[in-house]
Amino acid sequence: MLFRSSVKPGDEIIVTNQEHEANTGVFRRLAADGIIVREWGVERDTGALNPSELDHLLSGRTKFLAVSHCSNIVAHINPIAQITTKARNVGALTIVDGVAFAPHGLPDVDALGADIYLFSLYKTFGPHQGVMAVRKPLTEKLGNEGHYFNAAQIHKRLVPAGPDHAQVAAARGVAEYFDALDTHHGGTHAQSRPERVRELLHGAEQPLLHRLLDYLKARKDVRLLGPSVARERAPTVSFVPHKITPAEVHLALGKRGIMSGAGHFYAVRLLDAMGVDPARGVVRLSFVHYTSPQEMTQLIEALDAILG
């Protein structure tokens, strides 16, 4: 593992229980090497991380902090710029999992201050390829994972198996898609394009998210997980039905032509912390900027029929 050589027994790292297991489990294993693993826990009722609690965990011994930009279950958008500043003040690195946020916010990695930011291109309308943005000075400290004679080539140092050329070439389509989206809506200046695209995504998603949250909040037979206010979250909405199982809701939606998910979504620690049985799981509904108002109406009408 890349970070194994940069920490020693007695050093500390911070993880959260809000994460997809991919951004916490691998770091927790360092405890076997004498690394002290501190957990930043969520609030039981909301699933949110309280930034003030982080102050009690950070110290001069903290080497790095792993945190999600937003959870794939509660979808609360964490104040990453504030979190990375706190970590940097004690000399700690930050590893941010942006998978659940990237499709909805076009993150400005520099402004966020993350040392490493990860997301999946297939979540951002591209090929099935992972992306890891690493601050250049950090690549020197991480060492070479590739062939020894490629050590001086930054784009090869962290790719031990070599690049998947077809996927890398296809990644360009993501940028082209956002360019086309901006142009379609009257954008002309490339320099300000990222911010305009963020506003376009936000403007399309928020009204629909507001409708769904209001609907679920009004029901007494479900538990909505995460913020009930649209502006505080990404449009990934999870809930626990009280009368039937998440799997039953998922199957019934599928029969009505509506895609959903049911399960723990690899966030077992989070569900445990919130008092939700991971084996039963949650219903998860996700949508993006091209979801239509008509589709949201179809979803709400279907939930009415299924939940009773």
Where are these regions (language model features)?
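Pyridoxal 5′-phosphate
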Residues: 1-308
